[in-house]
Amino acid sequence: AGLRPWQASKFYFRAGFPFGFRGRSGPPPGALTINLAHYDALLGRTYAEIGSHARSMHKCQGMSPLIILPGTATASYRLMETTISDQSEQDEVSLFDGIDTSIEGLERFAGATPPDALRAGLIEVAEHAREALSKFQRDGADGVRESVVSGLGVVRNLRSRLSSLGLTEDAAWEIDHRLAAKEDQFERAVILAHGIRLEALADDGV
């Protein structure tokens, strides 16, 4: 129970100023630059707009309430330390370069020879997630209902079987901790895809 030891794989410092402020003509040399002007169709805004809107809510420190206008916006970061071999020598395009964030990648916690049943279960969970995303992009929320319900069942089944796969206590905890987050994501996707909304009302109507 409680928190377990962990170590960050990368440590970055911000390089330059956010949103391209102060007239910088280009990204700092040797820095990773992220495009903040990407439009998110689900959110209806760019990430720069979302960030500047949150920043405008400051009620102290003399912050400006101005919202960034549509257009080019970037943020740059410099990798200062990393536990990933030779990563500091790479020209990065993402903060996650060199880090396996896939569902299938969770098998690494099981050591050099993870159980076949674990590998198969993780692949199945990942396939349902990818299928749901593909159907959503093609058909919208109505098209993902079967995939997210099936995916929820698969991740719940895998979590229930972890203790029988011969994993060490630490390996089982690390994998289950992350699958619990994936289960929560599937649950929220099921609720959204089916348009479920619950409201709790008191007997007195208040």
Language-model region placement:
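Metal-dependent de-N-acetylase/amidase catalytic core
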Residues: 1-195
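Proline-enriched interdomain boundary motifs that mark the N-terminal boundary
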Residues: 196-200
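Short beta-strand segments of immunoglobulin-like
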Residues: 201-205
